[in-house]
Amino acid sequence: INYDSYRKPINSYDRKNRVLGKSKDELYPYYGATGQIGFIDDFLFNGEYILLGEDAAPFLDKKAQKAYMIKGKSWVNNHAHILQSLVFPEYLTNCLNSIDYFDYVYGTTRLKLTQENMNRILVPVPSIEEQCKIAQAINNLFVLIESIKASLS
């Protein structure tokens, strides 16, 4: 389910003024194409969502994250598509991070994934049990990678 129509763009100047003098517990995460980029004094969304970069995401970098999950109250800017999954969310997020976006994005200096092109992306949908197994196996591999990285530093 796509919630892009609920996004409200806000420039950095206005966002900065809205948080001025507010305590951390009065603020909500503010997300963009590749992750949290700050805080704001209001929220547009409350739930579990998958965010997929619309522009400014590293679409052609096979190792880079293009989609990520958020939970709770938040504000998402107009540089990320906002999705709620009808399948296991971790599975869909992993699928969206493994897709070759070459045929779905356009632009020379700043690649863009339009909603129309995003809707053309086909994701295999096995049973929910299989989705859970796949997502858990991928998560276990990421934990192993982080463990190895930590032991090397």
Short names for language-model regions:
Residues 1-32, 124-153:
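Non-catalytic DNA-recognition/assembly elements of restriction-modification systems
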